[in-house]
Amino acid sequence: MMRSTFAIAAAVAGLGVAGCGGDDKALTKAEFVKQGNAICAKGNAELETEEEELIADGKAPDREELIAFFEDEVLPNVQGQIDDLAELTPPEADQGEVDELIASAQEAIDKSEGDMEAVVASDENPFDDADEKAGAYGLAECAI
């Protein structure tokens, strides 16, 4: 169970999402991927630090500690990644693909916030679809 829980944390931390973007000029796909990966890498590093603190005593966290970790650290971090990536303007030709990615990621966040106990207890990762979409788009730092 610990392995699956930390696997979900890693997947969530690396979640790659992108959004509709602001009113800025559209980026090229290469620019979008570069900036998106930088956003995810920063978020991942922050979560790695938090996870190291969680397991610093060498003892596996109990269920309540895991739930608190997800609620207090993982989900806000990933939501921040989603929000930051949504500020990027993807290439016009990729808008639909990017919209699907962000919708999938937000759905996973909402599901997780709605029943964190079930997410922690499950071997399934609610972010699998978003991770797959991120990886397919080239956001390697965002799809773990």
How would you name each of these model-derived features?
Residues 8-13:
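Hydrophobic helical h-region of N-terminal Sec-dependent signal peptides
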Residues 21-23:
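Bacterial signal peptide processing site
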